[in-house]
């Protein structure tokens, strides 16, 4: 077996964290031959819950789990890590405006960005799951910039990507394995653009483009997009809790593919720092289609847009620029 990977999960006492840690520990994310040292971080008030999660992981008797430790301070959490799942964030409460939510999260992700710079390896790879994920990733990357390159920071839009795959499979009466290359553009929010223009569906051994497979353009430009955009809210309405199982699976898919690479001819959606591709402002954490090889993602180039797609992408870009500006103002206001 190879040397253990040290993997941090923040917010590990919460629902999503609880669902993520088992997938990391049992080899789903990094493979059955790769031992992991799991570090679970949460606030001191959750130390008892964290200890219970540690006990459960020990009781799973997993060959790939080299060690597991629960911590409540950033130095212990971030020291020497290879991967970070930043799940913990301030949730939006009733009556809270976006700027208030951003201000609360700026403090958390500024602190974690600085901790990454001070204690983590320069090769550490980071996925931000806690919302607003794109902007939280932007802030963490900003404060870790002296040590960890921006390309090592990402935010999760794989949940939206997986939701889009599932809806397309349901509509065409096939299975997930027969659908590929959906794209989530932009923010992990209600403005995201789930795009199937370049997606394909394999039915009865024949691969066809998604629009032809569905045969209903109005559906793909209306209800399909709305279903993916609003899915999280619908699940809260039904369960009275936010998506946890599906969010954890998506975070693990995201890191699995970053670690092992994407399959030939397939791309996935990741929110990563823009390099100016498709006219998206440089540095904005924006969901793009990417391919991954050797642990490095690349934005898929040369895709074309119609006016409908351009309008959707412009709307999500505008929202992300506003979020970024509000977050930077919160940094200034808090003198951080």
Swiss-Prot record:
Active site, per annotation: 188 (proton acceptor)
Enzyme class: oxidoreductase
One cellular component (GO) term of this entry: cytosol
Annotated compartments: Cytoplasm
GO molecular function, one term: L-malate dehydrogenase (NAD+) activity
GO biological process: malate metabolic process; NADH metabolic process; oxaloacetate metabolic process; tricarboxylic acid cycle
EC number: 1.1.1.37
Binding residues annotated for NAD(+), in chain numbering: 11-17, 42, 105, 112, 129-131
Disulfide bonds: none
Record: residues binding substrate: 92, 98, 131, 163
Thermal response of activity: Optimum temperature is 40 degrees Celsius.
Keywords: Cytoplasm, NAD, Oxidoreductase
NCBIfam families: MalateDH-SF1 (TIGR01759), MDH_euk_cyt (TIGR01758), PRK05442.1 (NF003916)
Summary of subunit composition and partner proteins: Homodimer.
Function, as annotated: Catalyzes the reversible conversion of (S)-malate to oxaloacetate in the cytoplasm where oxaloacetate is used for gluconeogenesis.
Family in the record: Belongs to the LDH/MDH superfamily. MDH type 2 family.
Name the UniProt record assigns to this protein: Malate dehydrogenase, cytoplasmic
Gene it is expressed from: mdh-1
């Amino acid at each position: 077996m190879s040397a253990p990977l040290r993997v941090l999960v923040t917010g590990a006492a919460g629902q999503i964290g609880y669902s993520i840690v088992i997938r990391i520990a049992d080899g789903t994310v990094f493979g059955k031959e790769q031992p992991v040292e799991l570090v679970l971080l949460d606030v001191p008030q959750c130390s008892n819950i964290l200890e219970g999660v540690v006990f459960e992981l020990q009781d799973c008797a997993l060959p790939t789990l080299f060690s597991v430790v629960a911590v409540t301070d950033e130095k212990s959490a971030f020291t020497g890590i290879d991967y970070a799942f930043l799940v913990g964030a301030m949730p939006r409460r009733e009556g809270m405006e976006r700027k208030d939510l951003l201000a609360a999260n700026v403090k958390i992700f500024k602190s974690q960005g600085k901790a990454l710079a001070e204690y983590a390896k320069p090769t550490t790879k980071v996925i931000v799951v806690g919302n607003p994920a794109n902007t939280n990733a932007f802030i963490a990357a900003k404060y870790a910039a002296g040590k960890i390159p921006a390309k090592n920071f990402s935010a999760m839009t794989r949940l939206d990507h997986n939701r889009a795959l599932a809806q397309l499979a349901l509509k065409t009466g096939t299975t997930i394995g027969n659908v590929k290359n959906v794209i989530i553009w932009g923010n992990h929010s209600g403005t995201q653009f789930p795009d199937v223009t370049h997606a394909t569906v394999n039915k009865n051994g024949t691969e066809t483009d998604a629009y032809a497979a569905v045969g209903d353009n109005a559906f793909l430009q209306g209800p399909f997009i709305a279903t993916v955009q609003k899915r999280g809210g619908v699940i809260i309405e039904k369960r009275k809790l936010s998506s946890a199982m599906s969010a954890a699976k998506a975070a693990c898919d995201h890191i699995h593919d970053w670690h092992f690479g994407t399959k030939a001819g397939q791309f996935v959606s990741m929110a990563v720092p823009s390099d100016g591709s498709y006219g998206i402002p440089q540095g904005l954490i924006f969901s793009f289609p990417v391919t991954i090889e050797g642990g490095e993602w690349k934005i898929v180039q040369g895709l074309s847009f119609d006016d409908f797609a351009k309008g959707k992408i412009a709307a999500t870009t505008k929202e992300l620029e506003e979020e970024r500006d509000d977050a930077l103002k919160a940094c200034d206001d808090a003198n951080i």
